[in-house]
Amino acid sequence: MGQTNSRHSLIETDEPTTSSRVSMLVDRVKLLWKRYTTPLSTEDGSREAHFAVPSENYADTPSRNTPNSSNGFPSETLVTSSAHCSTQPHKDEAYSHHGYSSTMALDDSSLAQTYHEYEEGTSGNSPLRRAIGSYDFLHPRPSGNSSRLDRNSSRPFTSSFHSAPFLSSYGSSNDPSQERVNEYSLPSNSNSTYTTPLQSINNEHPLPTVLENNALLNNSGNSPSLINHLRQYLNQDFSRLHQSPSPIPNSNDNDSQTRRSSWSSIASAFNDFPEEFPNASNPEAHSNFTPLNGNDESTVNMLSRLLSAAAIETVASIMNSEARNMDSQNMANGEPSRFRSVDGSFEQFLTDLRSGNLTNVLQNSSQNGNDQISSDPESNSSDLQYLRMFRFPSFHQSHNQPASNNEASDTNGPALVPVLIVCMRSISETSEDHAPTMTQENQSLHNESRENISINDITERMAQSTEFSTDLPPTFERSNSTFSHPEPTRSDFSQAFTPVSDFPANLFPGSRNLFPTSNSGNQSTSSFSRYNQPTVSVDLRNSSILRRAQEPVNGSTGENHIGDDYISSLLDSSNSNSQRPFSTVPSESNVFSRNASGNFSMSQTHQPTTDNTSSFSTQPGRLSTGLHHFPSDRDLLSNQTRRSSLARSYRFEEQLSVDDNTSDFSTLASNGAADMVTQTHSEGTFSNSTHGDWLIYVFGGLFPEHHPVLSTVSLFSDNPMYEDLLALTTYLGPAKKPVASHEDVKRSGGLFAYFDDASLSSADSCLICLETYTNGDICRKLQACKHFFHQACIDQWLTTGNNSCPLCRAHGVTTQAEEEN
């Protein structure tokens, strides 16, 4: 009567089941029959059963209605002999479906009859029994490409098809179809295309648990991040042998080999845990390693870790954000990191550092091949110096995407090439003062030598210059408040620095900007330049570059005790019972102590002069930051004068911010150079009458692709040429920033007394000393930009730091020379 669906009505059964149950069973049996039963004839006339083998991809869905295949099953067949299958068709009508032929007519009446036969258990050899009773043999474990759930040989093959409702309904323990009947088993003879032993097949495979699935799905996300590699690398003790705990997730999966190879390539860049690290007890671990005595070895290895960590962090910081994001995606996908230098020199440099071989690195790169660290106290060997530049591929080069100049200019501008510059200077100073014995002839020769270029001048300009020339892009980020710290009073800042003599502009890198001194004795000293210079912040989380706690010899106060086991564990990264002797000079320093609120506050400690054999014992629970020596002599290249300069130096405790939750601290440098100065002691390779400082500069920048410095090949080699070094100093700009005189500052005016006014509410603290303004404070306002600061702070800044506004870098005051011009 116009019905489009001419289906026969189902035969009613005597079973107390609902029509929905029958309908579900019919649909399931129909689907099963269409997939698996297809009797056919062979050439010899025997009847063989033709079964469709399910694809390995069917684990996601039990049925797929695709036009080219029967519900997602390929046209592979399993051929069995005629002895195992009935040759009698169930009906005379023929039926075909998607290329699979059958002699049974699948109408609703026949299916209902089959259902009755199954329920009554009288059809042991019926087509339904052949289809359902042997379903466990129709899902064998593939012998070829297997799913990732089956890569473990000890895990049986599982899939969602085994847990499908139409199979689990017949999977009860009292179901006779689960018994292994030889009549329906697949033989392992030559006629079978399936070679997996039958005994390995089971129809009750346990499905993976939720935890196992999550572990497999999230396996690619278990890779440690770069900062974790860095944390592990810094926390290891280079003076001991370490067996590396593998950062690769423990898994027996075959696909983990890809992750292992990718992680091995990443580990080769950082090599956090070498299996055997060279030390005094195992010098054969590295062919070029020179054994050092206990404390010397710890110091050199600590310097190696520090320099390596700073280099890796700086490289990551100068890579543009697009390259960093792409590199993170590559690492997440199991591909190796793309942070590689062009010629591989940076990797070799890190390898030398990871070998604890800092001394040999410096010796091999010194200007004079005979310059070595000697134990002879009368030795006049030059200070070891090291300068290396490393070039990294740009974003387009690293991803093999050559773009024309027009395309680069239209989209993101010219391609910028990351360049890393590493400088180290080892300064060995003697307590003997040779300055009075210097003759006039030697002094004239010394002054003449200052006109020549040297690596000292290079490192000096690197530290002093805050900007490159106009042809170069800005290299360092400007930051007015890079780290948080307590609010000290102005008296604390004025007492924190005890200058002994005036610092010349061409002396130690960053000395004028880091530690400003006044030319007049009545002018207060404040630490201002470190908060407003372009800085490179080396962010190393949970690491141990904080120097180990050291107990002052005479009269130490208990203010520097920190009752925090977590901080103590950071400080005590190696042998907590080791002793580290080194020489000291009279100084006043700041010691940070933790208050009740969890912050660190400064306190003053005076450390008297001690001889060279004085020792400081390492004790956990104490925090002492980096020790800095800054000679105050004007001469730069004279070894004898430089040796005597430390007798008139002072000590400054580097100010750090430590976050209780993340153990995050940042070491700030002046004018864009990461000054990481660590004192070594006089034992073993150093004589007892000498002590030395290491000056380490690690910073980088982005240069245009066609910049002349990138075409200078020798700058990126171990032995740069004199002319190229001279050109590099030109690119870096002048070492000394223009300053104003006291007369120029006084003539500029702008003095006023601060009172809490609505018009000044936006500037509630001085950005130089970071102290909150109080009523009655004398301030000076710059005429060019209208920014104001404490009079003492801004006067010190303009006369000793830079004649510019600390906030906006606008011109400070007009000098007399500018007025004349």
Curated annotation (Swiss-Prot):
Keywords in alphabetical order: Metal-binding, Zinc, Zinc-finger
One Gene Ontology term of the molecular function aspect: ubiquitin protein ligase activity
Gene3D superfamilies the record matches: Zinc/RING finger domain, C3HC4 (zinc finger)
Origin: domain of life: Eukaryota
Residue ranges crossing the lipid bilayer per the database entry: none
Zinc fingers (RING-type), renumbered ranges: 766-809
Protein name, per record: Uncharacterized RING finger protein C4G3.12c
InterPro entries registered for this protein in UniProt: Znf_RING (IPR001841), Znf_RING-CH (IPR011016), Znf_RING/FYVE/PHD (IPR013083)
Zinc-finger among keywords: yes
Compositional bias (Low complexity): 517-529, 568-578
GO cellular component, one term: nucleus
Record has Transport as a keyword: no
Biased composition (Polar residues): 58-88, 185-203, 279-293, 437-450, 579-622
